[in-house]
Amino acid sequence: MLNTGTVEARTVRKDTLMMDPRGVPVSYDGQMVRDRYETSLTMLHRFGYDPVPAVEELLEEYPDFALGHIFRAVCIASGSAARYIPEIERSLASAESAGGALNDRERGLIAAVRKRCCGDWRGAQTAVEQVLAAFPRDTLALHLGHQFDFLLGDALNLRGRIERLLPHWDSSIPNYSHVLGMYAFGLEESNLFDHAEAVGREACERDPADTWAHHAVGHVIEMQGRHEDGIIWYGSREADWATGDGLSIHNWWHLCLYLMEVEDYGRILEIYDS
């Protein structure tokens, strides 16, 4: 079907393997759609702004974009609230009925999210690992696994899941910096503070808008009781992490913890009032 105006012509082809910029297969043949999806994916990895409205707008125009529905489900499933399970299931059902042939990677992501919805968190971790074993540059699967590990307090996998994938990555691959940001947090949660800080700072230099990487470095500094360094870390980079409706609010809270330790209560109240 050929759409007019700004709507892109596309087909779902079973005989051609379509790839994203990291070489991960996508079942949708429509470059403009996939480019817009990549923008939402980067938003997800940065933890700065909520990517769901952007992908919902995309899905209004292209309701047969199965990966977009899976992405929406992953975003919602990255939290632990049970009340959102019906919304997650709705997105998964939309992906399955989108009209095209899902690939193995997409079916694997659906299986992982479904296990999470059923309360089988360990099974969900395993399902994500199976996707990553086949597609080690799938950052949507990596994000999902990272959040599962975080919610379960699984420090070993927070670090190890990413270490298993690093041989497949280098700095030329899109979203490499976000992999480093996740790795930094896993290292910090494993008490490997010096390595975590170095990796987290590198991630922030590669993508200054990576709020999760800022958060990882902030955790290191807090764990080491370096309160003045924490104030400098967040204060000197405020333009990079402080905006948005995602993790920036949590990073403000971390900054206030440092300020509380040095008894700068006036600044804390200024932040609260703003």
Q: What is the predicted function of each stretch?
A:
Residues 2-3, 7, 13-14, 20-33, ...:
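Intrinsically disordered, low-complexity protein-interaction/activation regions
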Residues 32, 63-68, 104, 137-141, ...:
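Residue-level recognition of tetratricopeptide repeat
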Residues 36, 69, 76, 108, ...:
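TPR repeat positional signature
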Residues 54-57, 85-99, 122-132, 155-169, ...:
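Alpha-helical repeat scaffolds
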Residues 161-262:
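Internal metal/ion-chelating core segments
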